[in-house]
Regions:
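A helix-coil-helix interface module used to build multimeric assemblies
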Residues: 1-165, 169-175
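Conserved small/polar residues in nucleotide/adenosyl-binding loops
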Residues: 176-184
Length: 186
């Protein structure tokens, strides 16, 4: 929302003074959220509506201008990307830790023989180390898949609109620069 407010001001869609007021109001709301001082009302549809209501209560009508040239669909798409990106990083770390444990177990069992199975039947002798490395390699492929997915999370949806963007002269490149995304979604 701060990036959106900054872009609205820079593009002259709203007055710079209003943009600055919105940004300062949002910073205050963020600080209060982090301090546990804000409790969201179920009277409003979602967190975005709650924040806009609190912002308007704090700074007046300028708070209503935050939604100018923006779709809630954009906000939800961005929130999902930010959440998934954060979770992918956490999941990837857990998988890598698991891979390290598998590799350590493999290293400690280079000569521990066990039966290998095919179609639920004993097939040939293998080492437990070899068996552990098979799982480590499966996990490695999962890490690669997560990294590929992570790249897609860097596409910035702000400004896409619910259907066909907006008639306001927004600057999507500025939005993705301010949000630190890699590419702008078409």
């Amino acid at each position: 929302s701060m990036a959106h407010a900054a872009m609205l001001g820079k593009q002259g869609i709203i007055a710079k003074e209003e943009s600055d007021k919105i940004i300062e109001g949002l910073k205050g709301i963020l600080a209060d959220i982090e301090a546990g001082k804000i409790h969201f009302s179920q009277d409003y549809e979602d967190i975005h509506m709650n924040v806009e209501q609190i912002l308007t209560e704090r700074i007046g009508d300028a708070g209503k201008r935050l939604h100018t040239a923006r779709s809630r669909n954009d906000q939800v798409a961005l929130d999902m990307r930010l959440y998934v990106k954060k979770e992918i990083v956490a999941i990837k770390k857990e998988i890598i830790d698991f891979m390290e444990a598998l590799c350590e177990s493999a290293k400690n069992n280079l000569e521990t023989v066990m039966p290998g199975y095919t179609h639920l039947q004993r097939a040939q002798p293998v080492t437990f180390g070899h068996y552990m490395m098979a799982y480590a390699n499966m996990m490695r492929r999962d890490v690669i898949r997560l990294e590929n997915c992570l790249e897609g999370m860097d596409d910035m949806p702000l400004g896409s609109g619910a259907l066909a963007s907006t008639t306001y002269p927004i600057d999507r490149c500025l939005l993705y620069t301010l949000r630190a995304h890699e590419t702008v979604l078409d």
